[in-house]
Amino acid sequence: MAAKSDGVLKMKKSDVAFTPLQNSEHSGSVQGLHPGAQPDSAGAGDADFANGESRCCGGGGSHSTCLRLSREQQKYTVWDCLWIVAAVAVYVADVGSDVWLSVDYYLEEDYWWFGLTLFFVVLGSFSVQLFSFRWFVHDFSTEDSAEAAADGSHMDGNKLLSGSASHGDVTAQHHPATPQRQASTASRNTTTNSTASTGLGPRGPKRPAYYTFCVWGSQSVIHILQLGQIWRYIHTIYLGVQSRQSAETERWRYYWRMVYEFADVSMLHLLATFLESAPQLVLQLCIIIQTHKLLAVQGCRLFIYYLLILAENAALSALWYLYRSPLATDAFAVPALCVIFSSFLTGVVFMLMYYAFFHPNGPRFGRSMSGHGLNLDPTAQFSTLPSEVATNSLRSNRGATATLERDAGKYSERDGCMPVFQVRPTVPSTPSSRAPRLEETVIKIDLCRNRYPAWERHVLDRSIRKAILAVDCSLTPPRLQYKDDALVQERLEYETTL
């Protein structure tokens, strides 16, 4: 804000946007409007407030672009309050789930994952509280400096107003006295007199020391307890309610304070997203992959997932199209919607083509998606190969009984992994008059060997060797039995590598 040499008060466009909060105590002197008076729209210039005249921000003189908001824009609705409550619920759920996950890792004695998870939680929370407290210090000190500057500029303000009044009289003599300008001059003189008598009169005492101490102490405790963001949400709701219950002259002050407070808390939430949520998501994905807890996605679940993604894209696109600015988006609105949905459809088509024609293990439709999708129920029926075909290369493994027993004892203590190949022991024959029927040992193979790297294939081969040596002392050679028809093609590979 600056004053000309002849005493005319000038304000730039950049001063208008922050006027409601910078001089919230003197709404009449800032806006240059009498309560209920209409802004003067005669003439255009460089958007200066000369002699207290009020000009519209857009330069066109329309009521929707003036500094004083319309009644609909100033009204704080219930939906605004519900959105803030939803934001609080999301924030609490986010932090609570992270803390619960850290405690779960600690109870499972995964101290490395516990430390990393808790580190990202603490890093994001402390960063957000630091920014929030820094903004509080800046706002509180700005209010104190503004009051001190206002107390020290009483005499300068009186001189400025007297110069403006004299210049207004001269202006009224030089310009034609149209009815609109006469009304504007009268309104300007009334506003100037009321401002000189009330706005620039003796101000009240400064803030007491105990009040400043209480504010600083309470804000420090709130931010130490990591509740600064929650406090700002609650303060935003309080300012919104005050903007509805206050008088007409004070309503715009609370409304603008609520808008600025909500902008601050939204920026804090954005910082928390980048500093805590995004690293936490990457960390948990790495933990899932390294601990082999990632389960295969079934076809029905995959269909439901992409259906939800399509519904979400459609809802957001529809909301954007309905509430967009027509003048700025008419040129690309429809092409943008076409690109969004065509890209989604193209991705789904390519995914289906990959699983239908280009998957390394053949078409995936109609069979299990991966080895984890196989039915591991031990009561399931197994497809049995002919005995003479499946055991041709295994007959040479028989030898002396003593040697086999010694080898079986040697291999039974090795490779303490879970049994991949289930061995069905020989059923003892019951005494009868007829000759006993020899029961053969069957080795059931449940996993596809080609789906594993070379090292894991070697581990599987050692497991099947252990199973064969453990039952090689039987009278009949063991027989391989496969659970899935897709595994039949690996029979020769098993038999040639053992």
From Swiss-Prot:
Localization, UniProt: Cell membrane
Region of interest called Disordered, as start-end residue ranges on this chain: 24-46, 166-203
Compositional bias (Low complexity): 183-198
Gene Ontology CC: plasma membrane
Record's keyword annotation contains Cell membrane: yes
Catalytic activity: a 1,2-diacyl-sn-glycero-3-phospho-L-serine(in) = a 1,2-diacyl-sn-glycero-3-phospho-L-serine(out)
Keyword list, A-Z: Cell membrane, Membrane, Transmembrane, Transmembrane helix
Membrane topology: Multi-pass membrane protein
Superkingdom, natural source: Eukaryota
Gene Ontology biological-process entries: apoptotic process involved in development; engulfment of apoptotic cell; phosphatidylserine exposure on apoptotic cell surface
Transmembrane segments: 81-101, 111-131, 302-322, 332-352
Function: Phospholipid scramblase that promotes phosphatidylserine exposure on apoptotic cell surface. Phosphatidylserine is a specific marker only present at the surface of apoptotic cells and acts as a specific signal for engulfment.
Similarity-based family: Belongs to the XK family.
Name used for this protein in its record: XK-related protein 4
Annotated source species: Tetraodon nigroviridis (Spotted green pufferfish)
